[in-house]
Amino acid sequence: MEARDVLKRPVITEKSSAAMAEDKYTFDVDTRANKTQVKIAVEEIFDVKVDNVNIINYKPKKKRMGRYQGYTNKKRVAIVKLKEGSIDLFN
C-alpha cells in the first residue's frame, strides 16, 4: 500500500485541534493500514519524525431510512504523535 493510499484526510475537530498543541495529529486512515504503515506514510508525506501511533476502530452503526435498514461504513482513525516539528495542515 502506498503512502497516499494509507492516509485519507486529516480530522479537524475541536478535540483534535486541542491535541495539535501537544504535537498529536489525527488522520482518517485506510481500514487495512497498520501502525507501521501509518508511521511510514506520515514521515514520507510530511517529512517529520513520528514518536508513536495510536489507532481507533469505529464499528458501523445501524441506520434506518423509513422501513429500510442498513449500516454506516466502518472507520479507522490514527492519532500520530511527533518527536519534533509540526505539520502545516492549513496550506
Curated annotation (Swiss-Prot):
- Name the record gives this protein: Large ribosomal subunit protein uL23
Entry GO terms, CC: ribonucleoprotein complex; ribosome
Kindly give the Pfam families that the UniProt entry links to this protein: Ribosomal_L23
Subunit and interaction comment: Part of the 50S ribosomal subunit. Contacts protein L29, and trigger factor when it is bound to the ribosome.
Instruction: Write out the similarity annotation.
Output: Belongs to the universal ribosomal protein uL23 family.
Q: Which organism is it from?
A: Staphylococcus saprophyticus subsp. saprophyticus (strain ATCC 15305 / DSM 20229 / NCIMB 8711 / NCTC 7292 / S-41)
GO BP: any one term = translation
Molecular function in Gene Ontology: rRNA binding; structural constituent of ribosome
- Which NCBIfam families is this protein grouped with? PRK05738.2-4 (NF004363)
Could you tell me the keywords of this UniProt record? Ribonucleoprotein, Ribosomal protein, RNA-binding, rRNA-binding
Annotated function:
One of the early assembly proteins it binds 23S rRNA. One of the proteins that surrounds the polypeptide exit tunnel on the outside of the ribosome. Forms the main docking site for trigger factor binding to the ribosome.
